[in-house]
């Protein structure tokens, strides 16, 4: 079943990027946004499981990563 995940701005709540696929997760959505070189400044990634994610080239300036698993 396809699931849509949205990455929102942590202050305004506006949608920065959304992605829909089978077995979707915040990690898959974030990696797709990075692959497409989307602007993720201010992204709300609090508590996200991002272990092992290759975020090179991602623009996460001002993103909220509080409690995110980045190791």
Where are these regions (language model features)?
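Extended, small-residue-rich solenoid/repeat segments and analogous flexible loops
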Residues: 1-71
């Amino acid at each position: 079943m396809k699931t849509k995940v949205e990455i929102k701005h942590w202050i305004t709540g506006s949608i920065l990027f959304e992605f829909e696929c089978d077995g979707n997760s915040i990690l898959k959505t974030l990696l797709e946004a990075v692959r497409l070189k989307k602007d993720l400044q201010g992204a709300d990634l609090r508590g996200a499981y991002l272990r092992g994610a290759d975020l090179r080239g991602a623009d996460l300036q001002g993103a909220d990563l509080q409690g995110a698993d980045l190791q």
